[in-house]
UniProtKB/Swiss-Prot annotation:
Recorded topology in the membrane: Multi-pass membrane protein
UniProt entry keywords in alphabetical sequence: Cell membrane, Membrane, Transmembrane, Transmembrane helix
Name of the molecule in the record: Uncharacterized protein slr1875
4Fe-4S listed as a keyword: no
Residue ranges of the TM segments: 34-54, 59-79, 126-146, 171-191
Gene source species: Synechocystis sp. (strain ATCC 27184 / PCC 6803 / Kazusa)
Compartment(s) where it occurs, according to its Swiss-Prot or TrEMBL record: Cell membrane
């Protein structure tokens, strides 16, 4: 199988496409690496430095479904047919893919199969499901600026999974944990006004060590 960047480039730019494409057509690229590639494709619009608007919530729901199936140890991915048949303008999809290809190629330059237990073991898939599911929920939170970083972590984790690269997958999961802490702080500030987890930790350290 060709690298994912090449598959996407061929599909969207070297073959004639109609005015619209649907999710099922794009997911046909995935073949045997369905779980990882689906995570990459669904997180990409929100993971871009300038995110494509309108995708975080619906794709977040689908990513959460993927995460549940990872935790359950499913070998075949199930997504609702009604969602698979939803269409997007080909020109819009091409714009998203074009913006994401440079990032994908950078990761491909350093990726290769290693640490297979992270991607293939039951425990590894459970941990992936937990971190990806948590980030999918974060993507759906209607607070400005809370979509991009969770989507980036899902993108990295999914990329590592489809490359069978346990190092990159593990990095994506660690990134997810760090983002989770940040997201809790952001949500706390949003609802309580101005006090972050960092401020709370500083106060706690002052009490513990007698700082001023």
């Amino acid at each position: 199988m060709a690298r994912l960047s090449q598959e996407l480039q061929d599909y969207f730019f070297k073959e004639d496409r109609g005015p619209t494409v649907n999710l099922a057509q794009v997911l046909a690229i995935a073949k045997e690496k369905i779980f990882g590639i689906v995570l990459v494709i669904l997180s990409l619009p929100s993971a871009l430095p300038i995110p494509a608007p309108g995708y975080s919530t619906p794709f977040g729901v689908l990513i959460f479904l993927v995460a549940i199936q990872l935790m359950a140890g499913r070998q075949e991915l199930w997504l609702p047919l009604s969602w698979q048949s939803k269409t997007i303008k080909t020109s819009k999809a091409q714009g998203i893919v074009k913006a994401g290809l440079p990032w994908l190629k950078r990761l491909e330059a350093i990726a290769h199969p290693r640490f297979p237990l992270v991607c293939q073991s039951r425990l590894g898939k459970i941990l992936m499901g937990i971190t990806v599911g948590s980030m999918a929920i974060s993507m759906m939170i209607p607070i400005p600026g809370t979509n991009t970083l969770p989507a980036m972590s899902i993108f990295i984790t999914g990329f590592g999974l489809q490359e069978d690269d346990g190092l990159i997958t593990g990095a994506g999961m660690i990134f997810s944990v760090l983002i989770g802490v940040l997201m809790v702080s952001v949500i706390y500030v949003f609802f309580n006004g101005g006090i972050t987890i960092i401020d709370i930790l500083k106060d706690w350290l002052k009490v513990q060590f007698g700082g001023a």
